[in-house]
Amino acid sequence: MAPKVSDSVEQLRAAGNQNFRNGQYGEASALYERALRLLQARGSADPEEESVLYSNRAACYLKDGNCTDCIKDCTSALALVPFSIKPLLRRASAYEALEKYSLAYVDYKTVLQIDNSVASALEGINRITRALMDSLGPEWRLKLPPIPVVPVSAQKRWSSLPSENHKETAKSKSKETTATKNRVPSAGDVERARVLKEEGNELVKKGNHKKAIEKYSESLLFSSLESATYSNRALCHLVLKQYKEAEKDCTEALKLDGKNVKAFYRRAQAYKALKDYKSSLADISSLLQIEPRNGPAHKLRQEVNQNMN
């Protein structure tokens, strides 16, 4: 039975959300449509509310397998509020379901420019990359549509949203581990991982650490057994002052290779930045047991000791 709701956009949207959570996608879609009509009839511009309603109705269409209307609504939502993550993800999923892999790839990559830890986008890129390599061959990247450059303002808008809007990112690291670490990569996956890691290395040389993180993350989706990929991504996190992420990546690197000197050094740097001087000194000590004459490590130890005094 449909809920009784008054002619309030907010109440209609809330009722639609409840129906969606209950799996009543048709009813939810109808409520979002009523809210859209009411909002548009008012004549007062509220692009963010209108964008959310289009995006929510798109989610209903996607659940019902109506990919064409999902894409239309996501495009309408993005026209109102460009670079919104949810409509980008939903449109990417719809494109993927329709086997429009190039368009799906563009939307997933756009999401990763906004937040490079969104699990569903990372997993989507993994699937789409395989499909594109199989269908278009080794030069598949040259055959893609242009990938839009996300302005800094859009990235800041996303990072400033309340924490409940970031639920997808909170699980990204654990999803990465469960999705990739429990399987042995094929020879083809190992090669793809190597190529992506090299692309990341080239981006680091050019000073583009944010895009390099994306490449390393893609590489790890194909093969999570390369210690150097984790320690290389840790370097990027350090440059971007993402110290906790750097520490986590170095820890993963050391699980794979307990003598990874760069991982010890970079984790020591991260601990120093986090003011965990005891852990920093412990990593430096471990490093110097492997390379007693490592100059940067000796210098870092002096800096940490000075900070402790």
From Swiss-Prot:
Ranges of biased composition (kind: Basic and acidic residues): 164-178
Subcellular location: Cytoplasm; Mitochondrion outer membrane
Modified residues annotated as Phosphoserine in this record: 8, 160, 186
CC terms in the record's Gene Ontology section: cytosol; mitochondrial outer membrane; mitochondrion
Cross-link (Glycyl lysine isopeptide (Lys-Gly) (interchain with G-Cter in SUMO2)): 197
Top-level taxon of origin: Eukaryota
Alphabetized Pfam families for the sequence: TPR_1 (PF00515), TPR_8 (PF13181)
Gene Ontology MF terms: heat shock protein binding
Listed GO biological process terms: protein targeting to mitochondrion
Keywords: Chaperone, Cytoplasm, Isopeptide bond, Membrane, Mitochondrion, Mitochondrion outer membrane, Phosphoprotein, Repeat, TPR repeat, Ubl conjugation
Region span, Disordered: 158-187
TPR repeat placement: 9-42, 51-84, 86-118, 193-226, 227-260, 262-294
Key word Repeat present: yes
Membrane topology type: Peripheral membrane protein
Alphabetized InterPro entries for the sequence: CiliaryAsmbly_MitoImport, TPR-like_helical_dom_sf, TPR_rpt
Role: Plays a role in the import of cytosolically synthesized preproteins into mitochondria. Binds the mature portion of precursor proteins. Interacts with cellular components, and possesses weak ATPase activity. May be a chaperone-like protein that helps to keep newly synthesized precursors in an unfolded import compatible state.
Subunit description: Interacts with HSP90A, VCP, ATP6V1D, KIAA0665, AMPK, and DMAP1 through its TPR repeat.
Stated family: Belongs to the Tom34 family.
PANTHER family (alphabetical): MITOCHONDRIAL IMPORT RECEPTOR SUBUNIT TOM34, RNA (RNA) POLYMERASE II ASSOCIATED PROTEIN HOMOLOG
Descriptive protein name: Mitochondrial import receptor subunit TOM34
Organism, as annotated: Rattus norvegicus (Rat)
